[in-house]
Amino acid sequence: MTNSLRRCLAAVMALCCTAGAGAQQRPLVVELFTSEGCSSCPPAEAAIGQLSARADVVALAWHVDYWDDLGWRDRFELPQSVKRQNIYVRNLHRASVYTPQLVIDGRFDAVGADGSAMAKALAAQRTSVPLRLSVHEAELLVDIGAQPQSPGCDVLLVPYLRHATSAIGRGENAGRTLEEFNIVREVRTLGSWKGEPKAFRVSVASLPRDATDVAVLIQPSGQGPMVGAAIQPLR
């Protein structure tokens, strides 16, 4: 794991440890772009596993497909992962996609991260949109409260698999068994939100069969800084 990624994770941990007293603080969203074919990714995956145990973090691992040429096809790869990463690369003024890339709250990534400056900025910007998730009679209920003067946002539903192990047969990780956490299985846009009270209903049966949990992200259109996030176990 690179020094910049270590600094980024240290800043996240420090911020989470100091944010607990704020009852209205929403969870911090930590997104990892990763691949089973990348030998630098397992330590970052382990960090996602640690973060996923925290109630004050929404940790998601997006598996990309551009490592396939090295001989191993990631069974969890999604075209949407690459699309999402490319938007962040543009927004964060990076030259190209890479793994492992850690994006924090849609605002920072690990490249050149200044840990103390990042933690301070994140703490100052963590607005909280009223967001409640529940499951009732095989339906996922998403209820968003009012938040005046909010930017136009997308409401994203992200089903994920909490934990998996994969035996890798080829590529950079050949011969290893990898532990993977909070693996994104799909992303769909439920609708838009502009600060008004809003509700969505989703049939649990319509979600990927291997999804164990869902995250809902409220994010300005174009993948701007997060304004809301919550998770809900499906079983």
Which residues does each PLM region occupy?
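N-terminal signal peptide c-region/cleavage motif recognized by signal peptidases
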Residues: 16-20
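Secreted/extracellular small peptides and ectodomain modules produced from precursors
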Residues: 6, 14-15, 36-39
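G-domain G4 guanine-recognition motif of GTPases
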Residues: 63, 106-107
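Short, conserved sequence motifs used for protein processing/export or organelle targeting and
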Residues: 75-99, 107-235
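Bacterial N-terminal signal peptides that target proteins for export
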Residues: 1-10
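Ligand-binding face of N-terminal immunoglobulin V-set domains in extracellular IgSF glycoproteins
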Residues: 102
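Active-site-proximal cofactor/substrate-binding loop regions of enzyme domains
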Residues: 22-92, 96
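Cleavable N-terminal signal peptides
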Residues: 10-11, 21
